[in-house]
Amino acid sequence: MSRLPSLSRLCLAIACSALLGGCVAAGDVRPFAELAPIVPVVAPVAQPTAGAIYAAGPSLNLYGDRRARDVGDLLTVNLVESTTASSTANTSISKKDATTMGAPTLLGAPLTVGGLNVLENSTSGDRSFAGKGNTAQSNRMQGSVTVTVMQRLPNGNLVIQGQKNLRLTQGDELVQVQGIVRAADIAPDNTVPSSKVADARIAYGGRGAIAQSNAMGWLSRFFNSRLSPY
């Protein structure tokens, strides 16, 4: 049996690698955002009193509500997110050129060869370009995530952070929420809408069969990248 040329063997190796690569399971479609670990808040140890009626330490407001206000308190964020965006672009360019040069004459007689005006010339050019693009996107998210107050700023605003991890039959779903909440925006039931969260970072992602089914393969990603010649 004759040996295959080097180029043919190289093409065969690339084809085999592509087939094997298609069988490899894709990784996480959307890597989860990195959140700093939630550090447990340790309550300060009560200092023994010297017999006085009042002592310095945590206080309890008997007539106040249970809204989050201190580091370590829990707060429920109601996710009410809805965004819609659309864009349309149309471009059309056209250019035409035409040039005609008559046959020169010598002493009033045209210069001909075999009865033809060989020096008579005309040129024309036509260029055109047309492009059209449309894009539309709509996102909607509803739900709730209970977060932890990580820091209380000098002006009373609360830095919050939390996540919810759901393990389903065909994969995992994760919702993460970070941001800054104004204490005045917290409702009496200790909830706040996501539209009231400043510097909000809301991430939603998944792992598993459902997430992988919505991801393009490596070959499709190549033809949709800048490296594609088409």
UniProtKB/Swiss-Prot annotation:
Q: Where in or outside the cell is it found?
A: Cell outer membrane; Bacterial flagellum basal body
The protein's name: Flagellar L-ring protein
Q: State what this protein does.
A: Assembles around the rod to form the L-ring and probably protects the motor/basal body from shearing forces during rotation.
| Description of how the protein assembles with itself and partners | The basal body constitutes a major portion of the flagellar organelle and consists of four rings (L,P,S, and M) mounted on a central rod.
Q: Which GO terms describe its biological process?
A: bacterial-type flagellum-dependent cell motility
Organism, scientific name: Xanthomonas euvesicatoria pv. vesicatoria (strain 85-10)
Its membrane topology is listed as: Lipid-anchor
PANTHER family attached to this UniProt entry:
FLAGELLAR L-RING PROTEIN
GO CC annotations, alphabetized: bacterial-type flagellum basal body, distal rod, L ring; cell outer membrane
